Amino acid sequence: MLGRFQLGTMQGRLVPKLNGRYQAHPKGYWRDEFNAAAEFELELIEFILDYEDADINPLLNDIPAICSAIAETGVGVESVCADYFMVAPLQRVPRSITVLEKLIDASVQLGVRDIVIPCVDQSSLVDGSDTIAFVNVIQSLAEKANAKEVNLSLETDLAPRPFAELLDRIGSKSVTVNYD
């Protein structure tokens, strides 16, 4: 720890790339990154949930394995980058709501404070009806997140003013901003 700050890394940066991608959940060898992070004296890893192979990601099916890696290395997980929603936007793919509900529950078990929800590229809020649908979905999920003290941190490609307006429309203290 540097003063009051903790240092961490995005998952996939300390191990060989998965399919040529730096930012990806290293399926099959994700535990190796906890060991590498500990060797570099990093304190945190931002876990990733990709759309591809989401069903075998321990965030959705093996929380005890992540807890074990945390206990063995001392490297924590306080944030999750849910890149899953770039491919399956919450406002367009009904199953995504269930996935986010599971992530919120998993967050409580892991001590995760922030789930980053990308609203960029394929999941960009492209028009008014898309935005309305997103607001409706995120408001209901924000209640659950707030009750469990988890933030839903939005990463959007909106300009600052429309982004602020979106946050006002959502109206939840558990919906925050992530600038990448």
Segment roles from a protein language model:
Residues 1-108, 172:
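N-terminal pre-domain/capping segments
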Residues 10-15, 48-50, 82-85, 120-122, ...:
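Active-site beta-loop-alpha junctions enriched in small/polar residues
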Residues 20, 44-45, 80, 136-180:
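Acidic/histidine-rich catalytic cores of soluble enzymes
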Residues 54, 87, 124, 161-162:
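Generic structural signal for helix capping and beta-alpha/helix-loop junctions
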Residues 59-62, 124-133, 160:
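Active-site-adjacent beta->alpha loops and helix N-cap segments on the catalytic face
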Residues 92-114, 133-148:
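An active-site-proximal structural segment forming one wall of the substrate-binding cleft
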Residues 107-128, 148, 153-157:
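Active-site groove signature of glycoside hydrolases
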